[in-house]
Amino acid sequence: MEKFMLIFRGGINHAYNATGSEAAATNMQAWLTWMQSLGKNGNFVSTDPLQPIGKQVNGTNKVVSDGPYVEANDMIGGYLIVNAKDIDDAVEISKGCPIFNENGKVEVRPIQKMEM
């Protein structure tokens, strides 16, 4: 098995958009159910949501600015590391993600193995 990162972008019902609402609770349950199924199948490795605030450090002068400055539908809300046999398998795993119910998207990226 190889490791892949699923990067979650956009979505209308992220916890930071709908905290305390019925939509947020329903959305969170869908995510938990999906991730639990990945755990049972041996695909789940790790995950963390991201807060919508941050800083950017840019260029050779290392200029720091508030960020991220992206369109809402491109905001990275979190990521998930999965085990999959290949990228096609990882893409199939991503298709079960609840973010598609929120008009979001998933970027699937292979994680490069590194010797330390």
Located regions from the model:
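Conserved, structured core segments of small domains
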Residues: 1-116
